[in-house]
Design a protein with these regions (language model features):
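Alpha-helical transmembrane segments and adjacent TM-loop junctions that form the membrane-embedded core
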Residues: 1-195
């Protein structure tokens, strides 16, 4: 009888160890309650408008998370990075099972909008703009250009010195000339000129 009891205990412990080992080998995510806790923590961070593509995976007793957060589309890269670091740190601090978190910054709900994947980067776009703006003398005065890749197009912000506006050319006329020059390029959305 004692041998039977010991044998049953060995089978029980062996089964539990086998089940735990099997769970560690199989990718499983966190349960619904943990996912809701993660969502609450993320949405409590200032600057986070929404989140999507939240994925988790258990690695032994700990878990890893991967999430896309949506921030304002005109934030600087460094501010977006700072927000992502705050999200990461707060999640690791407040969700005990999380060992690491990968936070991606998005400026729009990219699962529902046109992709920006095929749009040109700055170098290629700059060549196009040089050609488009060749008949606008004030284009040589551009001090800074900011590109916003949004909804499948590139919105452009140009910064010109105040003296680019002369008595014969108003700021509005100059802005209209820059916008008209790129009107036929399907990759370009809005052109905003600031002085």
């Amino acid at each position: 009888v004692a041998a039977l009891i010991v044998a049953l205990m060995v089978v029980k412990v062996g089964g539990e160890l086998a089940w735990q080992s099997l769970r560690e080998l199989i990718d499983t995510g966190l349960d619904v309650e943990d996912l809701e806790s993660i969502r609450r923590v993320i949405l409590s961070i200032s600057g986070v408008k929404a989140l999507h593509l939240l994925r988790t995976r258990r690695v032994g007793e700990q878990a890893l998370a991967d999430v896309h957060i949506i921030v304002d589309d005109h934030l600087s890269v460094s501010e977006g990075h700072q927000i992502s670091e705050m999200v990461r740190a707060k999640l690791i601090r407040e969700i005990a099972s999380l060992a690491d978190v990968m936070v991606h910054i998005d400026t729009e709900e990219d699962v529902n909008v046109a992709s920006c994947a095929g749009l040109p980067l700055r170098d290629e776009l700059q060549k196009r703009l040089d050609n488009y703006f060749r008949d606008i003398p004030e284009a040589r005065l551009i001090e800074h250009m900011t590109l916003h890749y949004l909804n499948g197009r590139i919105d452009i912000e140009l910064l010109l010195p105040q003296d680019a506006v002369t008595h014969s050319t108003t700021a509005r006329q100059l802005a209209q000339r820059f916008a008209a020059a790129v009107r036929n390029d399907r990759d370009i959305g809005n052109v905003d000129v600031h002085f």
